[in-house]
Amino acid sequence: MEKLSANEIRQLWIDFFREKNHFFIESKPLVPQNDDSLLWINSGVATLKDYFTGKKIPPSKRLVNSQKALRTNDIENVGLTSRHHTLFEMLGNFSIGDYFKTEAIDYAYEFLTKKLKLDPKNLFITYYDGDDITFEKWKSLGFSNEKLIKGSKKTNFWDLGQGPCGPCSEIYFDRGPKFDSRGSELIKNEIENDRFIEIWNIVFSEFNNDGQQNYAPLKSKNIDTGAGFERIVSILQDGPTNYDTDLFLPIIAEIEKNTVFRYKIENYFLKKPRQTQINKSFRIIADHIRAITLAINDGVQPSNLHRGYIIRRLIRRAYWNGKKLGISHPFLYKLVEIVGKTLDYRFDIPTISKIILNEEENFAKTLEIGYNLLESQLKINKNQIKPVTVFKLFETYGFPVELTKEILAEKNIDFDLSQLVEFQEKHSQISRAKKTTGMQKVINSLTQIKAKISDFIGYHTHHIETKISFLANKDEEVAETNGENLSYVIFEKTPFYATAGGQKHDQGWIIQNNSTIEILDVFKDKFLNNIHVFKGKIVKNQPVFLKLDTKNRLNLERNHSGTHLLFASLRQEFGSEIKQLGSDNNEDRLTFDFPLNRKPSDQEIKSVENRINSYINQKIKRKYLVTNLEEAQKLNAIMTLEESEYMDPNSLRLVIFDKITTDLCGGTHIENTELLEKFTILSCQSKGSGIYRIRAVTSWNKYFEFLKGKIQEILSKISALKNKIKKIEPNFGLNLPNLVDLEQQFDYLKKIEDDLRIYYKKLLKSQLRIAKSELDANKIIEIGKFSFYLDFNLPLHNLKQIAATWREQNPRISFILGANLVNNEFLIIVSSAILASNQILEKILEIFTGSGGGNYKIAQGKIQKKPEKEVFIKLLWENITEF
């Protein structure tokens, strides 16, 4: 066994299986693409699932990968045990209907003993009782019965209850008695230990479970292998734990620069309690910063939602453990660069660091206060914690519930989570429900389709006479339809594009026997047949004429092509790390979702729009190229579009706009950028979790529709501003000219709106001088040791600004201010830096009928009539001790 770096081990794996004719699949992002069943990519095979189910055609029957994955279901064990991680890497080799048990075992043995030079004497094997082929194969490689451990269905049979399943064989490496004096009974009895390390698992998928525990042989047998990268590295580098390797030690060394504490590898055997806790904190930070960095790089922004909540939780857990090491300042953001080096991965270091720093700073502001609250509550309640305190720690101070639970566990304190269920549902929002919108309802008749029986010819043909290959209603195949219910038809050839890759289906007509029937929907089945939905009478054994709605197609092509140009322009504006998280193109508009660590400025969005219009003005021709995956990668084709799931990797269709972008795409596109005419961004809005959605339209018609809408919107704003100004200047007037040209009208009205806004602000500022003037000493009332200022004759328009300004200028005075409203009602504002404004208001509302609310610093309410000063003074004297 020779000592190798982690990067050398990974490359050895890839090169070894490439020599065995395996196609290398690069590590995919942690966020699953087109798979709502997963929160994260959580295994090496997760990104290849569609190849095994037959949904997608694999680039080769033999595949190899090194896939990064993320799991947080057992986060409490991270740092505590030798091998638990949030982010980990799985080495995988896979066979889809190609080699099987004998070759898979040969490859495993050869790689471990020849490439990694592990001594076979240190290898132990488990196998499924009854899997004689596997047993005999391992025996032929020199393994004795003592080294071959028989397993049960529970330990050595992969079965999800229904579908493909099969036995498995695990490979363990014996690290010797210094890790545990007990022998192979540790494996036999499934005892957690650090001596026998499982480094490899080969799953032989050879049966199908019908759901009733009846097993039938599969026609196509598969191999699914997973080898634990971090475990193999720790063995080859002789580290007692996974953390004692070049994957983690450089990160730990960087953490040590921020603290007087040191990580000590030798403590694994010494087991000094204080050092064990110190090591644990180092490990948690080193583990979490890897997951945090890679997840943010893959487009996840820290938030209180979904994946963003998990990343925020990891940041705060890591920051808390830094606190336990005496680190009282943000430091995690400094670790991003070293993470990139240890993972041999290129990151946008400045952007990721900035996001993490912002999270650390936000948490640091409330950490001390929140922790002190927790400590005080424990003292008051004699080491008991109330659910309401845990709720407040989350909502007010940003403590994830799980972090509070960990802090309490360290103090040996339990608390009941049952009362927090509703809270967790509301605030964790890590949805385990599958998405249902946009999914096709189950149509029983379509299960009768067993192969591809149709060709799409719509790239160049818009109408055709053809035959019907399949005709059905919801329940069964039919010879003709009755015209009363929805029906489904597959044609031998079709010009109608099916909804895919963010592009909506085509519209058009089926013509048969002088009857014209509208196409309602087009979608693909798993064989990539285009299934057309309609309502009308047609006969299967008679020819049909299909006619595309070309005007609708042009609008679809404009918007789909516009999406490509938008993606290219966004990469130009914000950098190549910009990713497409979703798109939706129909005949009316397009949308595009992308991650960014901040809100794009108006100037940046305008720059994106202007760049696209320059592409349009350049009149660039669109080209198509059909090639294989390897050639597409050489052309730097953008491979993230959703269309990829429908494509054969040996016959990929690229859409090319020279010098702008080359993208993998199966959709339809305009022939020249000039056909877009005009690209207009309608909005760029946050979807939460650091994801933004651009809505845009193409063509002059859509642009003018947009202008008309904006003009009406501006006119409404002008009218509102005019009314506000007239309340201050009753004689104010404004006449607007009628302009025919829409662009001129828009520009003119926008300027009027801006001018009015400026003028209105000037009027408010002039009124605000009241706030900046000296207080009237006659209106100051002394109640005990507190001072109150009462004034009920102030202007309504900026009363809240006056209250806030006076409070900041006079922090030792509490203000109760008022102004007349319509219908003889009266507005009251309470503003104080030293007393609870909301509690003062509550007392006011008890005496004077009304409603309102607020916070500690400022509160406002509405009462039925103007109050008398003497009543207020009496109220304050009677209740001053409660404020």
Curated annotation (Swiss-Prot):
Pfam families: tRNA-synt_2c (PF01411), tRNA_SAD (PF07973). It catalyses: tRNA(Ala) + L-alanine + ATP = L-alanyl-tRNA(Ala) + AMP + diphosphate. Its EC number is 6.1.1.7. Its cofactor is Zn(2+). GO terms for biological process: alanyl-tRNA aminoacylation. The keyword Nucleotide-binding applies. It comes from the Bacteria. Its main location: cytoplasm. One of its GO terms (molecular function) is aminoacyl-tRNA deacylase activity. Binds 1 zinc ion per subunit. Consists of three domains; the N-terminal catalytic domain, the editing domain and the C-terminal C-Ala domain. The editing domain removes incorrectly charged amino acids, while the C-Ala domain, along with tRNA(Ala), serves as a bridge to cooperatively bring together the editing and aminoacylation centers thus stimulating deacylation of misacylated tRNAs. This is Alanine--tRNA ligase. Catalyzes the attachment of alanine to tRNA(Ala) in a two-step reaction: alanine is first activated by ATP to form Ala-AMP and then transferred to the acceptor end of tRNA(Ala). Also edits incorrectly charged Ser-tRNA(Ala) and Gly-tRNA(Ala) via its editing domain. It comes from Mesomycoplasma hyopneumoniae (strain 232) (Mycoplasma hyopneumoniae).
